[in-house]
A protein has these predicted regions:
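Active-site and donor-binding regions of nucleotide-sugar-utilizing enzymes
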Residues: 15-177
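Membrane-interacting alpha-helical segments
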Residues: 2-6, 10-17
Length: 177
């Protein structure tokens, strides 16, 4: 509940945040709208595999997997989401045929539902420790398989999660693998 209130407060001030990020060239002038549920890429009918990683390191770590999946005839499209402009630019260096990039939506209930309704992924794979409560809850409400890949937790993070033990347990049980 507290998280949802906070994320909606951030949404209210997001135009100011986006303006400063555009000024600092940390947002793409035409693509920042993807974070608000305006899609710039077309979904192809068929099986879509979705990977999400925060930034460059996470995206680079999945390139070998994407290269293999590109050759799988059952998979029609591979969607990669991230939060940073630099990770988007890295992906453009590769000449993938089935793989596209979109920015991850703001983690409100509305934006995450809109994202899932449009893309309809067969499976969602979150790389490292990218944890977005509204998105993860909506993924499970849509009966989409959810994988946390290459996850790790530091001692510091573990102590923080332990403060909210029942919430953490409920949350992490949403992952299939």
């Amino acid at each position: 509940f507290i998280y949802r209130v906070l994320i909606n407060l951030i949404l209210i001030i997001s135009p100011v945040i986006i303006f400063f990020r555009l000024f600092k060239k940390k947002e793409h002038p035409s693509r920042f709208k993807e974070k608000f549920g305006f899609f710039t890429k077309r979904k192809i009918d068929g099986k879509l595999i979705w990977f999400h990683g925060a930034s460059v390191g996470e995206i680079l770590s999945i390139i070998p997997i994407i290269e293999k999946l590109e050759n799988n005839k059952e998979i029609k499209q591979i969607l990669i989401t991230s939060n940073t402009l630099s990770s988007s630019k890295i992906l453009s260096d590769f000449k993938f045929k089935k793989t596209i990039h979109q920015f991850f939506p703001i983690d409100t209930n509305y934006h995450t539902k809109k994202f899932l309704d449009y893309w309809k992924p067969s499976i969602a794979i979150f790389v490292d420790s990218e944890i977005w409560p509204n998105m993860i809850s909506n993924i499970k409400e849509n009966s989409i398989s959810l994988i946390l890949m290459n996850a790790r937790i530091t001692d510091k993070s573990f102590k923080k999660w332990k403060l909210f033990n029942s919430t953490a347990k409920t949350f992490f049980q949403k992952f299939d693998i």
